[in-house]
A protein has these predicted regions:
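Positively charged n-region of N-terminal signal peptides that target proteins for export
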Residues: 1-4
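Bacterial N-terminal signal peptides
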Residues: 8-16
Length: 261
């Protein structure tokens, strides 16, 4: 009898301790978002619709030694796709594309170019959702000793350079870049930026490498993120509006704390 009572009591205590643990929501929701597959369909892609981003295009800027008289730099979309992505392409009727860039410089040295998103004729920074842990993309290397970096802007407004490796290989390669934990991705201030943003790609030449004929192609830029990292109980109240206090105070002829700048 006593053993039965002890057993029932133990089960009751176990249930009491486990119930709150089971009921607590997870603080992690790891997802992967494809930012751009460079298929250039002329309409908003899935990420632009999901994140509320603008329908950006891509542009390029270069260092001063670029061969402008030769019409460089050149950028366009081309039919193509890495073999590893072809198996994942469920729409067999589609025509996957990649973004290509061709450069030629007048002399060796510390030459560079940047491929960046653009909207309405101005540079546009793509917002990340959640807290990104890694960014990866496919790049076609021409076996030149060039170096490629990712540029991101943190929630404090500082631009960080994330090295992705060199381009001394032939064909397609998937490059994966870990986002350092010290980069602030969310501002603690209500008036501060709510997310980290993607600024663009930067490619740098080795000072001793040939620079007269270089091609590079990009495909499927994506990132892995914890979408719940900045979500907390009462999150919906963070950006609530209290109304236009300044207009109310001016109409009544009295001042208030809401007028303080």
């Amino acid at each position: 009898m006593k053993k039965g009572v002890v057993l029932l009591t133990s089960l009751a205590l176990l249930a009491a301790f486990c119930a709150p643990v089971v009921a607590q929501p997870s603080s992690r929701a790891v997802e992967t978002f494809i930012v751009d597959d460079f298929d250039n369909k002329g309409e908003k892609n899935a990420y632009q619709q999901m994140s509320g981003s603008e329908q950006w295009t891509w542009n390029i800027q270069t260092s001063r030694n670029i061969n402008k008289d030769g019409g460089f730099p050149k950028m366009d979309y081309f039919d193509g796709q890495p073999n590893s992505l072809k198996a994942l392409n469920k729409d067999k009727e589609s025509s996957p594309k990649v973004l290509g860039v061709k450069t030629s410089y007048l002399r060796k040295g510390e030459n560079w170019f940047e491929v960046y998103p653009e909207f309405d004729g101005k540079a546009y920074e793509i917002p990340f959702v959640g807290t990104a842990t890694q960014i990866d993309f496919w790049v076609w290397g021409a076996n030149y000793l060039y170096y490629i970096d990712l540029l991101v802007r943190d929630a404090d407004g500082r631009v960080h350079t994330l090295p992705a490796g060199n381009l001394a290989f032939n064909g397609w390669r998937n490059l994966v870049v870990t986002v350092p934990g010290h980069i602030r991705q969310h501002s603690r201030l209500r008036s501060g930026p709510t997310e980290m943003t993607f600024v663009g790609f930067r490619v740098r030449t080795d000072p001793d490498e040939y620079v007269d004929d270089f091609n590079i192609f990009f495909d499927q830029l994506k990132y892995t993120t914890n979408t719940l990292s900045n979500i907390f109980d009462g999150y919906e109240l963070k950006d609530i509006e209290f109304g236009d206090s300044s207009s109310k105070s001016s109409s009544s002829g009295s001042s208030s704390a809401g007028d303080a700048k």
